[in-house]
Structure formats: C-alpha cells, structure tokens
Amino acid sequence: MKRIVELKERNYADASTHADAPVNYEDAIENYKRILDITGDITANIIAPNSEAVDIEGPHLIDNRMHYASKTLENIQATRQAGLWGVSMPRRYGGLNLPNVVFSMMSELIAAADAGFQNIWSLQSCIDTLYEFGNEEQRQKYIPRICEGEMMSMDLTEPDAGSDLQRVMLKATFDEKENCWRLNGVKRFITNGDSDIHLVLARSEEGTRDGRGLSMFIYDKRNGGVDVRHIEHKLGIHGSPTCELVYKNAKAELCGNVRMGLIKYVMALMNGARLGIAAQSVGLEQEAYNEGLAYAKDRAQFGKKIVNFPAVYDMLSRMKAKLDAGRSLLYQTARYVDIYKALEDIARDQKLTPEERQEMKKYTRLADAFTPLAKGINSEYANQTAYDSISIHGGSGFIMEYKCQRLYRDARIFSIYEGTTQLQVVAAVRYITNGTYLSIMKEMLEGELSCDCMKGLRDRVAKLVQLYEEAVEKVNASENQDVHDFLARRLYNMTADIIGSLLLIEDAAKAPELFKKSAHVFVRMAEEEVIGHTAYIKAFNPEDLEQFKAVEEENEEA
C-alpha cells in the first residue's frame, strides 16, 4: 500500500494547496479510514434501511424521463452531502484522489447495503475513462460536475450488439454547421440510463461494420436529444434503472480519437467496471453470509441450533472461505491496477525512469491477468453464496420478508453484465496458455510467509500447481481449437482455485486468527476441484466433443 500512496500523492505535493491533502503516508491512511468510516455510517444508517423500500418501488418512467425511487433519492443526497462522488479524481478537479483499493472498499460497503444503489454510485468511475482519454477542456468541464454528485452512465449495448460490441450501429455524424457530433439510434440495457453525463459508443466511420469504425462520445443531458423509451422490469437490482434510450440527433463531443472507441477506450472502461462488479459481488456475498450465519445461530430444530449440524456448518464454512479468498483476489487486483494507473498518470506530466517503465509494464500485465479472474470468480461466488444462504433459511428463505431472497435475485446479474463469466474466461485464457498464471503461482510459492503455520498448507497447494501445469500442457498440445474452448472454463476455475488458495494462505500467515480456518477449508475445496478437473482434462479426447454436440442433434430430431 505504501507504494500506491507514494505514487498517488507524488511526494504529497497537494498538501501545500489543498487543506484536506495528506502530508505523509500515515496521514493518507488515516484519511482513507475516515472516508471509509463515513461510508460505513451512511450504508448502515441510510442505504441499508432504505433497501427494501427501494426494491419494492423501483424507478418510474414519466414523460420519457426516468425518476428514481424516493428512497434512492435519499441515498443520493446522503452520499452527495458526504462528498462521496468523484472520489478517484485529482483534487484539482474537486476529487479526493483515492486509490482503487479504497474505492473498491467503498463499493463493497455500499453493495452490502444495496447492490442496486452500488450500480448508480459506482458508475462515477466512468469519469476515469474521460480523465485518461479526454482533453483538458473536457476534464475541466465534466469532472467537477461528477465530483459534485452528478450521475454517469456508459451507453454501449444495443438490441443487436450485446457481448459482440463491434456490431454497434448507433450513428455518429459530424455537424459542420454546429461544429459538433450528432448521435442517432437506440441503446438498450443501459444502467442508470437517464444520467447527467454519458459515455457513448457509436459508429463514426461511414460504411464500416466492425470495431474499427467505432468511436467514443460524451453526451451531456443538459443539451437534450435523448429520450428514455422504456425501463426494464428485472429479476433483481430493482433500484438500479436499466433503460432503453433513443438518441434523436443528440449533440455530443468526441472523446479521444476516432476509431479508438472499442479497441482502446471501451476496453479500459470495461476493465474498471469489471473491478467494480468484483467489489459488488464481495459486498453482497458478505451480506448473504451474514444473513445465513445469523439465521443458523437463531433457528433450532431437533433440539439444537441448526448451526451445529454438519450439513449446515459445511455450507457456512464454504461460504466464508469463498468470501475470504474472493476478497483477497479483489484487493490484490485493485493494488495492481493502482500501481500501473498511477504510473500512467505520472507519465502524462513527465518522463518515467527506465525502472518506472518496467514497473508499469509489470503491473499492467498483472492487472490485465487478474481482472477477469476477480470479476468472473467473485460474481460466481456471490451467486453460490446467495443460493446457500436461502438453503440455510429453508422454507423461510423462499418468503419475501427475508432479505436472502433479494440478495439471491440481485446476485444473478453479476455473472452476466460487464461481460459474462464465459467472456471472462475468454479474457483470461491467453494468460493460462502462455504460462502467465503459472509463473505467478510459482513465484507465490517461493515467497516468504509471515508464519510457519501455513507452510504445510502451501505444500499441498504446490502439488495442485503441478497438476495444473500438466493440465495446461495437455490442452496446449491439442491443435483442435474447439477442445481449447471447451476445456477453458475448467482451466479458469483451477487458476482461481490455486491463486485464491495462495492469497488466502498469505493472509492466514499474517492474521491466523482471522483466516486460518478459511484457508484450510478453501484449500480442501481447491483440491477437490483441481484434482477432478485435471482427471477430466487428461481423459478428454477431441472426439468426445461429438457427445456434447449430439445433445443439439437429438433435440433437432425430436
């Protein structure tokens, strides 16, 4: 953390011009703690108590405008008054200059209180993309507004362009007379779609049909030209408005350069959003575990509390182990992102030293490798934990009066939006096949542990790394791309199992009283998965694919 603060604060230069800026590392950490305390107070006393009413009411569509649920407005007002907007932005624009690690902690706290509101609040991170790729005039125009509490959205998806964003057809044409761009078309499934400032992916190049014809634009609601045609009625996250938008010759500004919208800017935007979903997942997972544990301690059957039944404490211990491992993965990823982004920011103002360039290259690679792991596996853990929380509640979990049913409904989208888990596998698979993850695992195995009590457990994980290496070699040896794609999810899960185990072992070595039990449980789970997946992969032959394709053929014959 010390390196992150050092890079973010640049020798604490802001202290001379901003009264709230830290003067040293200790001061910065105290500042982060104060902000987290404020966030925790608001989530506990306002957002969480409002969550049930928000879930019931949801947003409203009136005259082509979206209106938040009344309690959502209370949440927004509370976070505005506390200054919790634009928090990652430099102080010169009105931000708090917080690192991603702290932003992720805030996201986790808010998501535990209400995952739908976390969507609305965390979309402020879209401003990072404008800060990185917009010009200085745009930064000065828009960033202070976000820091004051205005809303953002990223308008990417269309009816015929979901995961395949290169099919986006919303049209951008340059208006020579007004010296601006005009946007026309429809966007669908836009979270917080009636926001104040939108980042919009649109087709600027006439006659193109692939990603190279797409650019990124800034739409300001103050200029008008966009209607909300529909608000989706969803399974969960009811407080988060999901909108269909109609762009009617809407005035917009180009962000960055033409043709770079998808291949560069959206990739940066999505990586930030995926880290946000990882934090959202961990927050909800914590709440689902808390609800399950509290119910198990209170509910008695057959003369004793159900928490004392092996079937129940098995579930609870697995929930806790996934939570602890997933959280460790989240914050390791956030640390990597913080270091490379801080160095990128410094490089805008001055030339980096050769050592700094190498450091940025290293942490960019690590962040790129860890982000799809953190998003994918934590979103899956959130779904599993919410499911198990309902199981612990039994029939009561199926009743709307209990919170666990809402957590279950809210969690379902986590493994879908901002790239399905299958797409996270696609993003991660090259780091599997080229040995990046394997190198990380081996480096972690060689690292010093704070406590010898975890060495035996790490030795067991070392055996899993050997199996993992054999499984990767088996897949790499195949020249059949369908085999690679078919087995990729198993390799991805194995990667998360092993890296999660090693991270949790490091945590347990530092704080055995907090993480030792979870580390033991998680390693057992990892052994169960890695050994099973390795056996499956080693026994798999290309012709086996036909057995799975046959399912579709049988349906056609029927």
Regions flagged by a language model, labelled:
Residues 83, 155, 237, 361-445, ...:
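Alpha-helix capping/hinge segments and adjacent helical runs
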Residues 180-226:
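A short core secondary-structure module
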Residues 1-117, 141, 345-354, 540-558:
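Amphipathic, small/basic residue-rich leader segments at the start of a protein or domain
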Residues 222-225, 229, 241-273, 290-307, ...:
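A glycine-rich, basic-preceded beta-loop-alpha segment at the flavin cofactor/substrate interface
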Residues 2-41, 129-135, 312-330, 336-358, ...:
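N-terminal leader/propeptide and maturation segments of large enzyme subunits in energy/redox metabolism
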Residues 324-375, 472-486, 505-509, 513:
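C-terminal helix-coil-helix/basic helical segment that borders enzyme active sites and/or dimer interfaces
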Residues 93, 435, 447-558:
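C-terminal amphipathic alpha-helical interaction region
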Residues 118-136, 162:
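N-terminal glycine-rich flavin-associated loop
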